Amino acid sequence: MSTVDLIRHVKLSTARLPLTVPISDAKVFTGRQKPMTEVVFLFAEITTEQGHSGIGFSYSKRAGGPAQYAHAKEVAEGIIGEDPNDIGKIYTKLLWAGASVGRSGVATQALAAIDIALYDLKAKRAGLPLAKLLGSYRDSVQTYNTSGGFLNATLDEVKARATQSIEEGIGGIKIKVGLPDSKEDLRRVAGIREHIGPDVPLMVDANQQWDRATALRMGRQLEEFNLIWIEEPLDAYDFEGHAHLAQALDTPIATGEMLASVAEHKGLI
């Protein structure tokens, strides 16, 4: 009698989370996107023949939510009967099932919910937190508020949010930059640095909206604020520009979150 547990069912669902206040980053000020008013989630729940289950999710902002759900729905049935331990094999199977629409972007974002659900299932069945299942090293990590200051918020509002984050034990603050007036960006960064002091980690995020010349100029002007990193100063696919910028500045450059495939990350690295 076989003891191999197989996938019996994949349940997909979607939900919209409306934001209390629309939020804006630099893409709004360049006219490339509208303010974000909601986040759309894709949930995947995988159940096995022996009754084990795992839950995963992915999400989209501004656009793509219905497409993620549709893509996942179209390919998910293909993993029924597979061994849930074969996570890499299953991911490759799903990737090729929808390869005609590409192996990045919406396609891989849709698969993320299923992939995460498989890892969740494996950890639950082992009776371990996922971190330990993967081979844990630390028992704590330093956190930061990635939404510390969108551009629709006033400087006073950003300061208040920073104070709240620090009081709650969050170890760093990231704020948005990329306003049409770069002097206003610098004023806001200076105001936050003065408010939180020199020792609290501070980062900025331009959301891909600077060109190379602007990124270099702003990067040099921002160095006095001892930033942990400057995030997405350039278009995510400008790999060469990021490399030149990283060599020219003392402040580290962070990027990569908009890349959704192994090939794209290989190109960046």
Q: Language model features by range: what are they?
A:
Residues 141-157, 177, 206-211, 254:
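Active-site mouth loops of central-metabolism enzymes
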Residues 9, 47-125:
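Metal- or metallocofactor-binding catalytic centers and their adjacent structured scaffolds
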Residues 7, 51, 75, 114, ...:
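Conserved, mostly hydrophobic/aromatic
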Residues 129-151, 195-199, 247-249:
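N-terminal small/glycine-rich loop or linker at the start of catalytic domains
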Residues 2-50, 55-60:
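Structured beta-strand/loop patches that form or line metal/cofactor-binding pockets in enzymes
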Residues 87, 130-133, 229-236:
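Flexible, glycine/charged-enriched surface loops at secondary-structure junctions
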Residues 164-176:
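Catalytic domains of carbohydrate-active enzymes, especially glycoside hydrolases
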Residues 175-269:
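Catalytic core of soluble alpha/beta enzymes
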